[in-house]
């Protein structure tokens, strides 16, 4: 990339790191088929770490009883709307936080995937067949940068299972080869934990030997506390993709620090519009008690900005160091892996879809198929079309100027998915950005430097 990689001296960044919260921040995504127990487990974890008080638990427990859904009260903690609680289905993405002694966790999008599987007879099978969500969720998580996966086999206390080792092994035997094919390193980066989300067995405290004599491994919390998350660079240039914004006595941008250090009082640039703003306040939570001087990579932040209006910032923008901005482009070259194209026979130049890149969602068109990549890695130039599960190099254009990075420079900011008619049809990585796309931001950086 034409831009310098680092910002400030190592000593300066080390000083800032000393001021930041020393606990690693881990973002966790709960994935899995409908009714596998994702919300129940999330609710149980919030409860066990004291992030939800007894009063809230009692309120939801009463509400669940009134609706004849007594076993669902933990899920109610994560179900945000009245409509969802009535149906007993979680539709919105629940955002909640909990802490242990060594880590701060946010249940959102994600360094770590918790794939929740139902051990109940028939439910695992329904989730794992072609129309179930287990496969797509696991594949999507991998694409979106989830390297570490914890497979939680839930409902082990259910009457068709009764903590039987055979059922746990059967599920692992079927799922493991699929995860391996999806690109997970199943030896190093996939962990298997049997639990009961509803009773809390093996979530924080180990399951009793009377109930389950064969499992001698760690609890879910023990696994989560010891996972090693790499790839975060506090010494790199500042990169904060904007997830949302709102007005609360000033403009507040929400996002996650992907690289560099975000410092209260510093100047930042908003891409793609090139506006300069001042960081008036940084919070790593929603309350006044969460105000910090410095946020580091992995932190979810609420940034109060001075010098910009509501209309100057939106989802998909990026907050960067003005001296080291990211490229902004409407065209790029990518390596693309197609998934199942059930709804279309072939994939050709001219194909339109919605591109999801970091927090941005933009309409895009495939302008040219440059080469088909064979299973042996060999390339066939200028293919006329592609079919399901083939890979290619292609040129893509967007309707809007969008901040982006090459995958080789910033994996999280150079990885994307293409969606069409509500389904993911391809996963890709940005391999080339036109040199001209760097020019405008370089000019703005030069002006700022004067």
Task: Report the location of each language-model feature.
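C-terminal effector/interaction modules appended to NTPase cores
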Residues: 1-28, 33-36, 87, 100-101, ...
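P-loop NTPase switch module centered on the Walker A-proximal segment
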Residues: 6-8, 18-108, 113-116, 120
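Residue-level signature of catalytic and energy-coupling elements of molecular machines
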Residues: 35, 41, 60, 86-88, ...
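Alpha-helical scaffold elements adjacent to nucleotide-binding pockets in ATP/GTP-utilizing enzyme cores
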Residues: 41-45, 56-59, 136-140, 167-178, ...
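Conserved nucleotide-binding/hydrolysis micro-motifs of P-loop NTPases
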Residues: 51, 119-123, 155-160, 197-201, ...
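Conserved Switch II/interswitch segment of TRAFAC-class P-loop GTPases
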Residues: 103-136, 142-169
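Short coil/turn segments at secondary-structure boundaries
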Residues: 127-129, 164, 205-207, 368, ...
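Canonical P-loop GTPase G-domain recognition
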Residues: 147, 158-237, 241-243
